[in-house]
Amino acid sequence: METIYVDMDNVLVDFPSGIARIPEEIRAGYEDRLDEVPGIFGLMDPMPQAIESYEFLAQHFDTYILSTAPWHNPSAWSDKLLWVQRYLGQAAYKRLILSHHKNLNDVHYLIDDRTK
């Protein structure tokens, strides 16, 4: 079976939905580093059709979630795990890989919002 990795931010997870839930006074303190706001990754909604799409892929591929977390936001690591448990369930959370070097993961396919 072929392996497919699916990114979280802006693929499974609607990053702007989390930003919208942060009070303006907190946002102002982080400027262009909103991914460093503690707890932001726990505030995000799924992208439209993301859950159904992930479930479809999981039926047809050896599917993993491959994401990165900001170095300066330690809660992001646990928040991402909790997000996967909440929206994708127990089986998916055991298939979560957090890495700053996605290129080190051997894979047939990668669904990611970044092109490089």
Residue spans for each PLM region:
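A short, structured active-site edge motif that brings together acidic residues
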Residues: 66-72, 77, 81-104
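Alpha-helix C-terminal capping segments
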Residues: 19-22, 54-60, 104-105
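Short, solvent-exposed loop/turn segments at secondary-structure junctions
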Residues: 11-13, 18-19, 69-72, 102-104, ...
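Active-site neighborhood of HAD-like aspartate-dependent phosphohydrolases
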Residues: 1-44
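Short, acidic loop-to-helix structural element flanking the phosphoryl-transfer center
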Residues: 31-65, 74-78
